[in-house]
Each structure stands twice: as structure tokens, then as C-alpha cells.
Amino acid sequence: MPVAVMAESAFSFKKLLDQCENQELEAPGGIATPPVYGQLLALYLLHNDMNNARYLWKRIPPAIKSANSELGGIWSVGQRIWQRDFPGIYTTINAHQWSETVQPIMEALRDATRRRAFALVSQAYTSIIADDFAAFVGLPVEEAVKGILEQGWQADSTTRMVLPRKPVAGALDVSFNKFIPLSEPAPVPPIPNEQQLARLTDYVAFLEN
């Protein structure tokens, strides 16, 4: 049976991941239940473990996949992650009605994606159009701008540009309630609107290589 999600913390999610992996290993005939597969697949995505996520998706029996649409929904989120489609990640997560055992994991994944996007923008840009920034962090423009102002960033209402503050190692992210991993990359000059999200996607690829 699936493991109940008791607390939304990094420790509890790691413990839950270990439990789900053990349940799959100990399952009769090596075939786990759909809820266990769902939790395990979502947890691999949460931990950005795309290799294990892909291997798990391949070994889930086709009959279980076809009979449990939630598994396909989780994997569709994984495909957006694989494509580094940040706006698509939020859209796909929000488009599904998740089960109570998967919902907390997907909410944590959405929040982790948002924090990662926030950190990437702070590292990669000296300025970015507010609408593009909002799409990248998956928030309404007004809410996104409010959050960055609380972080000490600047926003120009006339040009609708957001001006990230240069990261300071160990800075606490109050608005998103997490520490954001920071580094000291060279600043990147502004680029045209239509290239913003593509440039951010390329920057993600650069960091991961």
C-alpha cells in the first residue's frame, strides 16, 4: 500500500522515497501497486533524479499505465522537466487532480521548481521583462513582482522590467520560504523579449552540463 505523506520536508520526502523503493523491491513478482509507482515516480521528479524516473517509467507494466491515468499525468510533468520547460511544468502540475498520496509531492515539486527558477534568474540576468519572469516562476505578474521586491530586487513599472539583485551567498529567501543556492556567475546583459525564456532554458542546460 502507498505510504502516507506525513510532513512536507526534505527529510520526510527522502524517507518516503526509500520506503517506496523498498516496497517495489519487495512486491510480489516485482510488480508494485499503482499508488506506490505514482509516489515513487513523483518523488524521483522532486529529487530531480531523471535517470531513475525514466527507468521506473519504462519498467511499469503497460497494463498498469493504461489503467491508471495519474501515472501518465506524473510522467507528463517529467517530460516538461526533461525539456526544461519551466512554464510547462507549472501548467501540467496544475492541470491534474492528484490523489491525496501524490498531491503533497507535486506541490513540493512545483515549489522547488519555482525556487530553482528564481535562483537561475538571479544568477543569469541583470534585467528581464516582468511577464517573462512571472511565467518562469509560475506566478501572476503582480505576485511575482511583489515577491522580488521583498527580496531587494527592483522593478520598473514604466518599462515593466525586473532588475535582479546580485546574489549574496547564504541569502534567505523570505518570500519563497527557502534558502536559494547562490553562486557568482558573470552578469548577463539584457536580451530581446522573444529570447528570454529560451535563454533561461539554455542557461539551465549549461549549469547541468
Curated annotation (Swiss-Prot):
Q: Which residues form the PCI domain?
A: 8-179
Superkingdom field: Eukaryota
Q: InterPro entries under this entry?
A: COP9_CSN8, CSN8_PSD8_EIF3K, PCI_dom
A biological-process GO annotation: protein neddylation
- Identify one Pfam family in the record: CSN8_PSD8_EIF3K
TM regions (residue ranges) = none
Q: Which residues carry this modification: Phosphoserine?
A: S175
Keywords annotated in UniProt: Cytoplasm, Nucleus, Phosphoprotein, Signalosome
Report the subcellular localization. Cytoplasm; Nucleus
State a GO cellular component annotated for this protein: cytoplasm
Any idea what job this protein has?
Component of the COP9 signalosome complex (CSN), a complex involved in various cellular and developmental processes. The CSN complex is an essential regulator of the ubiquitin (Ubl) conjugation pathway by mediating the deneddylation of the cullin subunits of SCF-type E3 ligase complexes, leading to decrease the Ubl ligase activity of SCF-type complexes such as SCF, CSA or DDB2. The complex is also involved in phosphorylation of p53/TP53, c-jun/JUN, IkappaBalpha/NFKBIA, ITPK1 and IRF8/ICSBP, possibly via its association with CK2 and PKD kinases.
Q: Which family does it belong to?
A: Belongs to the CSN8 family.
Under the subunit heading, UniProt states: Component of the CSN complex, composed of COPS1/GPS1, COPS2, COPS3, COPS4, COPS5, COPS6, COPS7 (COPS7A or COPS7B), COPS8 and COPS9 isoform 1. In the complex, it probably interacts directly with COPS3, COPS4 and COPS7 (COPS7A or COPS7B).
Q: What is this protein called?
A: COP9 signalosome complex subunit 8
Protein source organism: Homo sapiens
Q: What lineage does UniProt assign to this protein's organism? A: Eukaryota, Metazoa, Chordata, Craniata, Vertebrata
List the gene name: COPS8
